[in-house]
């Protein structure tokens, strides 16, 4: 397992728990930080066989949303929609879980002359890693960009997911509360890179946050797969960000990291037991589980790019929020599974997405 982020550690945990011999390697020494909003939807957290409570810093049950800082609406869910964590703590926690399950962990290692024999290789070293290329996988990945920073804590934002849609073409701005600070950021299409710093300052100003108090300002890429992306070949596969498994609209990759890790682990166990000849069934499983959400994400992204007012007017409808709430909590597998008025709202949003295609 190359890379001990959420995807790599989850896959290592799953495999080791099933009795497989697993070597998990990473160039970093943990705990280490990663630029990321740090949110884990309840949908994602429910995938894990253990609780994330030890590293949760806030539980978000409120949505505060605007279109370019105007027409703001607020909604409150019946329960948590997402948990806020810091990657320093979350990733180390997941790594320790993998080690406790029996995975051999090697930190602070880079490519050198040592050789390791393995029946299966899984690349989980993120969008900046080299495993996909070395394994002849990946390709066809479209990148978005984001810029984030940390600012002093403000109780006004407790338990609240603040989203300012379309402040960046193809994306949004956010304010996420952590235990002792706020994470603020903006992200969108790669072409928006030169505007990110200016828009981050504006985001802060719009919410009464001092932009000069921002620290740890960092940029990063958001990898999004396309149908041309190869996820597996023979006894090799890529998962998580290394596979471009980031939602095109939300930019969330944590749910996809956990799902792809578990699907890859299941496929690997089939290979090890002789039930399968290679890891290709993993790619098919990703298509079944994640592709419908990815397709919906691309549709929502295009709708807000081309028809932002119409898309926003539909998104703020109470049935739309109820459908979103169920998706974030994992009570709906995909938007098309909505029923009643929620289904009607989703169909209207789909219609706008098709018109924007």
Regions found by a protein language model. Give the residues of each.
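Redox-cofactor binding/interface segments in oxidoreductases and associated redox assembly factors
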Residues: 2, 123-124, 238
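N-terminal Rossmann-fold NAD(P) dinucleotide-binding loop
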Residues: 8-9
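N-terminal FAD cofactor-binding segment of flavoenzymes
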Residues: 27, 31-65
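Conserved N-terminal helical subregion
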Residues: 46, 58-59, 64-134, 140-146
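Conserved FAD-binding catalytic core of PHBH/FMO-like flavoproteins
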Residues: 127-201
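FAD/FMN-dependent oxidoreductases across multiple families
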Residues: 190-276
């Amino acid at each position: 397992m190359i890379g001990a982020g959420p995807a790599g550690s989850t896959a290592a945990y799953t495999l080791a728990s099933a009795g497989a011999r697993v070597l998990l390697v990473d160039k970093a020494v943990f705990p280490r930080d990663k630029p990321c909003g740090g949110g884990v939807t309840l949908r994602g957290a429910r995938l894990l066989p253990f609780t994330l409570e030890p590293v949760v810093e806030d539980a978000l049950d409120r949505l505060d949303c605007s279109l370019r800082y105007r027409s703001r609406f607020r909604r409150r869910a019946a329960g948590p929609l997402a948990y806020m964590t810091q990657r320093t703590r979350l990733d180390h926690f997941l790594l320790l879980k993998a080690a406790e399950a029996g995975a051999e962990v090697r930190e602070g290692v880079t490519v050198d002359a040592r050789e390791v024999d393995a029946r299966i290789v899984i690349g989980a070293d993120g969008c900046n890693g080299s495993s996909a290329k070395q394994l002849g996988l990946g390709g066809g990945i479209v990148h978005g960009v984001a810029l984030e920073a940390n600012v002093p804590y403000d109780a006004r934002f407790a338990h609240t997911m603040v989203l300012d849609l379309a402040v960046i073409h193809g994306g949004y701005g956010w304010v996420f509360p952590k235990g002792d600070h706020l994470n603020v950021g903006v992200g969108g299409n790669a072409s928006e890179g030169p505007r990110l710093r200016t828009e981050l300052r504006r985001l802060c100003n719009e919410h009464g946050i001092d932009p000069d108090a921002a620290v740890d300002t960092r940029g990063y890429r958001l990898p999004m797969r396309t149908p041309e992306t190869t996820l597996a070949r023979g006894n090799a596969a890529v998962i998580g960000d290394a596979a471009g498994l980031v939602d095109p609209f939300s930019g969330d990759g944590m749910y996809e990291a956990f799902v792809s890790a578990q699907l890859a682990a299941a496929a690997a166990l089939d290979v090890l037991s002789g039930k399968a000849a290679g890891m290709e069934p993993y790619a098919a499983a990703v298509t079944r589980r994640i592709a419908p959400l990815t397709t919906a994400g691309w549709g929502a992204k295009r709708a807000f790019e081309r028809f932002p007012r119409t898309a926003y007017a539909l998104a703020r409808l109470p049935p739309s929020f109820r459908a979103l709430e169920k998706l974030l909590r994992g009570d709906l597998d995909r938007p098309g599974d909505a029923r009643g008025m929620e289904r009607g709202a989703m169909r209207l949003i789909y219609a706008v997405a098709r018109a924007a295609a």
